[in-house]
Amino acid sequence: MLKMGVLLFTFLVLFPLATLQLDADQPVERYADNKQDLNPDERMIFLFGGCCRMSSCQPPPVCNCCAKQDLNPDER
């Protein structure tokens, strides 16, 4: 009878508590919420990780990346 009580307690109380997700266990949602306020060009830089080489760069209508590199550090 004691074994049955321990088994029921484990599956009816402890197992559901272990499977609950707390708010702190979801960092991906907070990260996505922070990134949704950025404009699409800034998000593309995060996705691609960088810029083209200056020697192979196209004029600014095509390549926004090099145009941003030409800005003063205070304007970025």
Curated annotation (Swiss-Prot):
Tissue-wise expression: Expressed by the venom duct.
Pfam families: Conotoxin (PF02950)
Listed GO CC annotations: extracellular region
InterPro entries assigned: Conotoxin
A GO MF label: toxin activity
Keywords in alphabetical order: Disulfide bond, Ion channel impairing toxin, Neurotoxin, Secreted, Signal, Toxin
Similarity comment: Belongs to the conotoxin M superfamily.
Protein name: Conotoxin Bu15
Signal peptide: 1-24
Species this protein is from: Conus bullatus (Bubble cone)
Domain of life: Eukaryota
Disulfide bonds, paired cysteine numbers: 51-65, 52-63, 57-66
Residues excised as propeptide: 25-43
Swiss-Prot/TrEMBL domain comment: The cysteine framework is III (CC-C-C-CC). Classified in the M-1 branch, since 1 residue stands between the fourth and the fifth cysteine residues.
Locations listed in the record: Secreted
